[in-house]
Amino acid sequence: METELMRIGISLPDILLGEFDEIIGKRGYSSRSEGIRDAIRSYISYYEWMNDIKGHRVGTIAFVYDHTKRGLSNSLTDIQHHYSHLIKSSIHVHLDHKECFEVVVLNGDGKEIAELSETMMVLKGVKFSKLTTVASNENI
């Protein structure tokens, strides 16, 4: 059974598109469409993994954001305070005059950890976000 292909249009910053084109060239994709389909499949797989996080977990959320984006730093701080019962530590690094890198160390319920991660990753100005967790007992 052949799947119908849908044509879509997207807007990307030229630097991001340039990096993507370089990667798909190195990986040997026949077209941008092949690379984008693979990236979307990877994104869907990651989303499904995040939805399946259960039980007690330890982990980290690493993210890069534009601290000059109006209200973003305050929103990130408010979110972290709301989930302070999960947060054990955080590291904040100023990458340059515009971007910050932060790593938040977590310990608690997996569903809440995933919720915290998703709440932060969708904010406009968060450029990268990666949640990593492992199952653990509560004695950590």
UniProtKB/Swiss-Prot annotation:
GO terms for biological process: regulation of DNA-templated transcription; response to nickel cation. GO terms for molecular function: DNA binding; DNA-binding transcription factor activity; nickel cation binding. The keyword DNA repair does not apply. CDD domains: RHH_NikR_HicB-like. Gene3D superfamilies: ACT-like. Chain A, domain 2, Met repressor-like. Ni(2+) binds at H81, H92, H94, C100. The keyword Transcription applies. Pfam families: NikR_C, RHH_1. Binds 1 nickel ion per subunit. InterPro entries: Acetolactate_synth/TF_NikR_C, ACT-like_dom_sf, Arc_rbn_hlx_hlx, CopG, CopG/NikR_regulator, Ni_resp_reg_NikR, Ribbon_hlx_hlx, TF_NikR_Ni-bd_C. SUPFAM superfamilies: ACT-like (SSF55021), Ribbon-helix-helix (SSF47598). It comes from the Archaea. Belongs to the transcriptional regulatory CopG/NikR family. Transcriptional regulator. This is Putative nickel-responsive regulator 1. It comes from Methanosarcina acetivorans (strain ATCC 35395 / DSM 2834 / JCM 12185 / C2A).
